[in-house]
Amino acid sequence: NVVVLATGGTIAGAGTNAFASQXGPLGMVVEGK
């Protein structure tokens, strides 16, 4: 379950950080990167 943010970042769903952010500072923050 990956949600693409307006910033260009992504959130890996289902309680996992397995997916790296595709750029985008907000996505990185939400993923805890």
Swiss-Prot record:
Locations listed in the record: Periplasm
Enzyme class: hydrolase
Keyword Hydrolase appears in the UniProt entry: yes
Gene: ansB
Reaction catalysed by this enzyme: L-glutamine + H2O = L-glutamate + NH4(+); L-asparagine + H2O = L-aspartate + NH4(+)
EC number annotated for this UniProt entry: 3.5.1.38
Name the UniProt record assigns to this protein: Glutaminase-asparaginase
Keyword set includes Amino-acid biosynthesis: no
GO biological process, one term: amino acid metabolic process
A single cellular component GO annotation: periplasmic space
Active site: T10 (acyl-ester intermediate)
UniProt-recorded Gene Ontology molecular function terms: asparaginase activity; glutamin-(asparagin-)ase activity; glutaminase activity
Subunit: Homotetramer.
Induction behaviour: Repressed during growth on high concentrations of 2,4-dichlorophenoxypropionic acid (2,4-DCPP).
Keywords: Hydrolase, Periplasm
Boundaries of every Asparaginase/glutaminase domain copy: 1-33
Chief place of localization: periplasm
Signal peptide: none
Family: Belongs to the asparaginase 1 family.
The organism's place on the tree of life at top rank: Bacteria
